[in-house]
């Protein structure tokens, strides 16, 4: 199997390269760039200097059309321009950007501030929240990989929403991410002196992942209302913790909550539901494709609390992309992803 990565000089692209380089079914993994040609990836990431042939190539449709699958780990706007031509040529595309996540182009343009991809391809794209969309992923030609925050949030909410157990207008999500979630481009906001020993909120009420989360919730339950969603930058490299609050329609015991989630995620190799009274930490999924979930119910307030943690570069990006790629190719979804978290 021959694959290509566009955008291998960013954090998600580098993680993709690491995973695909060691994938049991991938014999060749080439890298492409819109800004560099003939430069070895090690110029950006010295840790891959021992990999022969990891030289960046210029973006060309004809060259990319020769691959079985092409991954886009690019900023918004790139895949929207290039992916349709590849799809038309029968190449399977896995897009890690947000260009194909939203079905309504006007909504994309409102939240991303740029022109949307052609409507035909927005409708054709399959949303790759793997655990809840396996059958569609298996048939996908254009796969839209979920964002990091939506992955943690939606995996945490799905059983409650699908079973109709929470009030539709009551969801509050308090999400925190490591600095790698802001990307590799240098900026004041991610400067060491600004991030170290500091926690800060950002994109209050305007984060582009809000409509993505709401769109999916409404496909599960048309009565779902807008959510309250806040994001914070934490002084760590990797990891997302989404702490989710929602008002239960009826009292539910912690044991029943845990049983619901374990049943919902039975057969999902990367979802680990904690015992009653136990809650996950980001360190416990570091470097892995796992999503760990802890649950509680407060009898005083009638609220359910869900704690969902992932590695933002793995389950929140490259790991989930490979999980979807596996299904698209007819393999076991866990191929190349079985590594346990790195600890400590």
From Swiss-Prot:
<dbReference type="Pfam" id="PF22698">
    <property type="entry name" value="Semialdhyde_dhC_1"/>
</dbReference>
<keyword id="KW-0055">Arginine biosynthesis</keyword>
<dbReference type="GO" id="GO:0051287">
    <property type="term" value="F:NAD binding"/>
</dbReference>
<dbReference type="InterPro" id="IPR036291">
    <property type="entry name" value="NAD(P)-bd_dom_sf"/>
</dbReference>
<comment type="similarity">
    <text>Belongs to the NAGSA dehydrogenase family. Type 1 subfamily.</text>
</comment>
<protein>
    <recommendedName>
        <fullName>N-acetyl-gamma-glutamyl-phosphate reductase</fullName>
        <ecNumber>1.2.1.38</ecNumber>
    </recommendedName>
</protein>
<dbReference type="GO" id="GO:0006526">
    <property type="term" value="P:L-arginine biosynthetic process"/>
</dbReference>
<keyword id="KW-0963">Cytoplasm</keyword>
<keyword id="KW-0560">Oxidoreductase</keyword>
<dbReference type="GO" id="GO:0070401">
    <property type="term" value="F:NADP+ binding"/>
</dbReference>
<dbReference type="InterPro" id="IPR000534">
    <property type="entry name" value="Semialdehyde_DH_NAD-bd"/>
</dbReference>
<comment type="pathway">
    <text>Amino-acid biosynthesis; L-arginine biosynthesis; N(2)-acetyl-L-ornithine from L-glutamate: step 3/4.</text>
</comment>
<dbReference type="InterPro" id="IPR000706">
    <property type="entry name" value="AGPR_type-1"/>
</dbReference>
<dbReference type="InterPro" id="IPR023013">
    <property type="entry name" value="AGPR_AS"/>
</dbReference>
<dbReference type="InterPro" id="IPR050085">
    <property type="entry name" value="NAGSA_dehydrogenase"/>
</dbReference>
<dbReference type="Pfam" id="PF01118">
    <property type="entry name" value="Semialdhyde_dh"/>
</dbReference>
<feature type="active site">
    <location>
        <position position="148"/>
    </location>
</feature>
<keyword id="KW-0028">Amino-acid biosynthesis</keyword>
<dbReference type="GO" id="GO:0005737">
    <property type="term" value="C:cytoplasm"/>
</dbReference>
<keyword id="KW-0521">NADP</keyword>
<dbReference type="GO" id="GO:0003942">
    <property type="term" value="F:N-acetyl-gamma-glutamyl-phosphate reductase activity"/>
</dbReference>
<comment type="function">
    <text>Catalyzes the NADPH-dependent reduction of N-acetyl-5-glutamyl phosphate to yield N-acetyl-L-glutamate 5-semialdehyde.</text>
</comment>
């Amino acid at each position: 199997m021959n694959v290509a990565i566009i955008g291998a000089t960013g954090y998600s692209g580098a993680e993709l390269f690491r995973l695909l380089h060691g994938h049991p079914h991938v014999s060749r993994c080439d890298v492409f760039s819109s800004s560099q040609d003939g430069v070895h990836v090690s110029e950006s990431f010295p840790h891959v200097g021992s990999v022969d042939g990891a030289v960046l190539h210029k973006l060309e449709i004809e060259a990319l059309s020769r691959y079985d699958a092409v991954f886009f780990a690019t900023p918004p706007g790139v895949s929207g321009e290039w992916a349709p031509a590849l799809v038309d040529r029968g190449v399977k595309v896995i897009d890690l950007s947000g260009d194909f996540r939203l079905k309504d182009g006007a909504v994309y343009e409102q939240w991303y501030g740029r022109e949307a991809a052609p409507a035909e391809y927005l409708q054709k794209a399959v949303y790759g929240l793997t655990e809840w969309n396996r059958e569609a992923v298996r048939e996908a030609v254009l796969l839209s990989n979920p964002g990091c925050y939506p992955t943690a949030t939606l995996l945490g909410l799905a059983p409650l929403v699908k079973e109709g157990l929470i009030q539709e207008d009551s969801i509050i999500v308090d999400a925190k991410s490591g600095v790698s979630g802001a990307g590799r481009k240098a900026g004041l906001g991610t400067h060491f002196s600004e991030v170290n020993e500091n926690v800060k909120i950002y994109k209050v009420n305007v984060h582009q992942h809000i409509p993505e989360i709401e769109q999916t919730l409404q496909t599960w339950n048309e009565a779902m209302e807008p959510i309250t969603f806040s994001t914070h930058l934490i002084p760590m490299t990797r990891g997302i913790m989404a702490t989710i609050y929602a008002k239960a329609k009826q009292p539910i015991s912690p044991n029943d909550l845990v049983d619901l989630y374990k049943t919902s995620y039975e057969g999902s190799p990367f979802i680990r539901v904690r015992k009653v009274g136990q809650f996950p930490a980001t360190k416990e999924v570091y470097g892995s494709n796992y999503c760990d979930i802890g649950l509680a119910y407060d009898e005083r307030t009638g609220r359910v609390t869900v704690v969902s943690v992932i590695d933002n570069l793995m389950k929140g990006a490259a790991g989930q992309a490979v999980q979807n790629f596996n299904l698209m190719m007819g393999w076991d979804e866990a191929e190349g992803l079985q590594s346990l978290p790195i600890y400590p």
